[in-house]
């Protein structure tokens, strides 16, 4: 790790820590402010009563209906894009199975892409379909997190908020203003924003090349701020139009972390104790630092088959190894999934770290909203285990944690392993799944594991060697994405409803403090143990075996 790489990391960390309380304070105000005149007029236009709050079940039904309509709308737009305007490249209809996979992918905040954006989607589909869903899926995740915060903040009530009010406030009051400013900065740095057709140019080698362009900047900002990750171009953030220089690369990474980190501060403020938010952020930071250090060290060792020289395969020279590895860890500890280097080209142990980041449940900052409520679910499990050790009924933020909450937490925690290992196991064993695996041996297993870890945890990044655009993978990965999204969200909302109905319990001498270092250590341990016990065998069979084979000079 050189001084330049350390400086990049320290600058990134300092900016994230500086933004966290500022954005956290603003979001606290946004979610608690009374309805204004302009806002009330907007609700009247849509037929929404902002004073009518919902119980957790009604909130969940609204969430599911909203996503169902979103999937149908995006599917239809893809199927009919050939007959619609803003299609200068003349893109035809997207095949049914690919359109279904893409609609599920963007509606669930996954943004897994079994296609090349510039060669498949029209400008209209990119803007009115994919970009719009980047806003809405991110807003839905934040809304669920806010509902959970209200569960802790309220007592003796059956309501957790109004889904339509929450998603409107997040979209109009938070995401749109930040994206407008951010997109203008990106345009100033050379990111295109136009409606032009692809241009044909003659390269330095004297051959012709078609260069796509379009409304890139507007999609790039929400792609990162909403931890969506789907690229306008097939190369994603490795493409110079998406990520032209080091400054834009830094802006992208800050946008990925900004809301997820700040929501911990909002959580502490709404719970009445800011230390609780810092404790959660501390646990996230510990896991992030460990992953970053391990990934950097593993990639810096170089390829042993080539005498240990630096591994520049799949990386952009303008960014280098340090910025590529920092981005790889940032994008996988969150549910973003954007990439500025090809993860399939990382050395085995370095490639394992992004995989592990996802397999831990995307709770290290995680997706906007989903990272917070995922870590809170682990916090509930932590205080439950701590309570068992001392023989007391566990409490968290003044609420007794009982059997119902723990059962719901376990359902939420087990949802993604079922999707990853269950459906991924089918892909490994069935001929339809094996047909898409390009690499032999342990790396082929890693490609499939990475794909379903990405889909099940709503990340969207990939080991590019897997041929995913088949009916089998389009269907199975869509199923994994839905399980990873909704079978986690619904139990979280049920937990919010159960907590909101409870009376607040004053802290006593026997209450386990959840704002100190001991709680942070226990929380990190629970996250690692659950992830390690669940996925350790398959990780050994994949990247660990590949590393040992590579060290012995065996290639696959």
Curated annotation (Swiss-Prot):
Bilayer topology: Multi-pass membrane protein
Keyword Transferase among UniProt keywords: no
Sections of the chain in a coiled coil: none
GO MF term set: P-type potassium transmembrane transporter activity; potassium ion binding
One Pfam family recorded for the sequence: KdpA
Keywords on record: Cell inner membrane, Cell membrane, Ion transport, Membrane, Potassium, Potassium transport, Transmembrane, Transmembrane helix, Transport
GO CC list: plasma membrane
Localization annotation: Cell inner membrane
Transmembrane parts of this sequence: 3-23, 57-77, 129-149, 172-192, 247-267, 278-298, 319-339, 346-366, 371-391, 408-428, 486-506, 516-536
InterPro entries noted in UniProt: KdpA
Subunit composition and interactions: The system is composed of three essential subunits: KdpA, KdpB and KdpC.
Stated role: Part of the high-affinity ATP-driven potassium transport (or Kdp) system, which catalyzes the hydrolysis of ATP coupled with the electrogenic transport of potassium into the cytoplasm. This subunit binds the periplasmic potassium ions and delivers the ions to the membrane domain of KdpB through an intramembrane tunnel.
Family: Belongs to the KdpA family.
NCBIfam families: kdpA (TIGR00680)
Annotated protein name in UniProt: Potassium-transporting ATPase potassium-binding subunit
Source organism per UniProt: Paramagnetospirillum magneticum (strain ATCC 700264 / AMB-1) (Magnetospirillum magneticum)
Recorded name of the encoding gene: kdpA
């Amino acid at each position: 790790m050189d001084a330049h790489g350390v400086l990049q990391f320290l600058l990134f960390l300092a900016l994230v820590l500086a933004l966290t309380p500022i954005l956290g304070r603003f979001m606290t105000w946004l979610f608690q402010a009374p309805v204004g005149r302009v806002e009330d007029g907007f609700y009247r236009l849509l037929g929404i009563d902002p004073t009518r709050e919902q119980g957790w079940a009604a909130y969940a039904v609204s969430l599911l209906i909203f996503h169902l309509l979103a999937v149908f709308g995006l599917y239809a737009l893809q199927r009919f894009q050939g007959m619609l305007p803003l299609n200068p490249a003349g893109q035809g209809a997207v095949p049914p199975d690919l359109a279904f996979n893409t609609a599920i992918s963007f509606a669930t905040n996954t943004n897994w892409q079994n296609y090349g954006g510039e060669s498949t989607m029209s400008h209209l589909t990119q803007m009115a379909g994919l970009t719009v869903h980047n806003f809405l899926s991110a807003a839905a995740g934040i809304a669920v997190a806010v509902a959970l915060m209200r569960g802790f903040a309220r007592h003796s009530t059956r309501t957790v908020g109004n889904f339509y009010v929450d998603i409107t406030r997040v979209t109009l009051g938070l995401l749109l203003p930040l994206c407008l400013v951010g997109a203008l900065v990106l345009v100033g740095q050379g990111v295109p924003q136009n409606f032009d057709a692809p241009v044909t140019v003659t390269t330095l080698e004297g051959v012709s090349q078609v260069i796509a362009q379009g409304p890139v900047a507007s999609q790039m900002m929400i792609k990162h701020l909403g931890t969506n990750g789907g690229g306008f171009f097939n190369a994603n953030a490795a493409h110079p139009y998406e990520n032209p220089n080091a400054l834009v690369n830094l802006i992208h990474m800050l946008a990925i972390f900004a809301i997820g980190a700040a929501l911990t501060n909002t959580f502490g403020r709404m719970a009445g104790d800011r230390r609780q938010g810092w404790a959660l952020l501390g646990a996230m930071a510990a896991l992030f630092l460990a992953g970053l250090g391990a990934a950097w060290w593993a990639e810096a060792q170089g390829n042993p088959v080539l005498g240990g020289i630096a591994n520049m395969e799949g990386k952009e020279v303008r960014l280098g190894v340090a910025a590529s590895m920092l981005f790889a860890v940032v994008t996988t500890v969150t549910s973003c999934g954007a990439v500025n280097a090809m993860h399939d080209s990382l050395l085995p142990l370095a490639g394992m770290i992004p995989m592990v980041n996802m397999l831990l449940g995307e709770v290290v900052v995680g997706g906007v909203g989903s990272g917070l409520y995922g870590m809170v679910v682990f916090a509930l499990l932590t205080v439950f285990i701590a309570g068992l050790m001392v023989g007391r009924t566990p409490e968290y933020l003044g609420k007794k944690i009982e059997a119902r909450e723990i059962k719901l937490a376990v359902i939420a925690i087990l949802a993604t392993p079922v999707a990853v290992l269950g459906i991924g196991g089918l892909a490994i064993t069935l001929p339809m799944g094996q047909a898409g695996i390009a690499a032999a041996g342990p790396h082929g297993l890693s490609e499939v594991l990475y794909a379903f870890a990405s889909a099940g945890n709503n990340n969207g990044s990939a080991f590019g060697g897997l041929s995913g655009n088949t009916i089998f993978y389009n269907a199975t990965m869509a199923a994994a994405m839905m399980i990873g999204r909704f079978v986690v969200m619904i139990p979280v909302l049920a937990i919010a409803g159960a907590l909101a109905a409870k009376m607040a319990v004053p802290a006593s001498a026997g209450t386990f403090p959840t704002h100190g270092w001991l709680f942070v250590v226990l929380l990190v341990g629970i996250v690692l143990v659950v992830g390690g016990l669940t996925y350790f065998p398959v990780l050994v069979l994949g990247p660990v075996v590949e590393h040992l084979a590579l060290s012995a000079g065996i290639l696959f």
